[in-house]
Regions:
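A structural signal for multi-pass alpha-helical bundles of membrane permease subunits
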Residues: 1-170
Length: 170
């Protein structure tokens, strides 16, 4: 038994066997989507969880409401936007919309996790002279590794399993 057939499928340059290139493209798109989701979700969830500002609950309600809209409903507007930006058949044209699919869930998940972190830790940091960015990056994010890991798994799986958007956008 040899691995010649696997080598042929994964590393062949023929048109019929480009599995290696497809795997690499899927990995780039899924990984880029995860990175974008982690950064944007964390930065959006922190103010929703910890800062007091007018309309905070309305924004969160709209975010939760957007989770109830099926992704298929947004395909045509998404396509038109990506087309106007000139992103069709590009990595950013696949990564940014894929991240948008998981963004609302990511903000919801991280906001709920941030609410569970004791506010006294932030108060102590403020007394020590930390600003909001330092509190976020040096206290909240290090404590959020479990939630960020879970979000990474969900976002990666969502991007990896998406077939319809790449079929339309490429």
């Amino acid at each position: 038994i040899t691995a010649d057939h696997y080598r042929e499928v994964l590393f062949s340059s023929s048109r019929t066997a480009r599995v290696g290139r497809a795997f690499l493209n899927s990995t780039i798109i899924s990984g880029g989507s995860v990175a974008l989701v982690l950064v944007t979700s964390a930065m959006a969830a922190y103010p929703l969880a910890r800062m007091r500002f007018p309309g905070r609950n309305l924004i969160f309600a709209a975010l939760v409401g957007s989770l109830m809209v099926p992704n298929v409903v947004t395909l045509v507007p998404q396509y038109l936007l990506v087309q106007q930006l000139g992103w069709l058949s590009t990595f950013q044209g696949l990564i940014v919309p894929e991240a948008g699919v998981a963004l609302a869930f990511g903000v919801f998940l991280l906001r709920q996790f941030f609410l569970g972190i004791p506010a006294e830790l932030e108060d102590a940091a403020r007394i020590d002279g930390a600003n909001a960015w330092q509190i976020f990056t040096r206290i909240i994010l290090p404590l959020s590794h479990p939630a960020l890991a879970a979000l990474s798994i969900f976002a990666f799986r969502s991007a990896w399993n998406d077939f319809l958007w790449p079929l339309i956008a490429v």
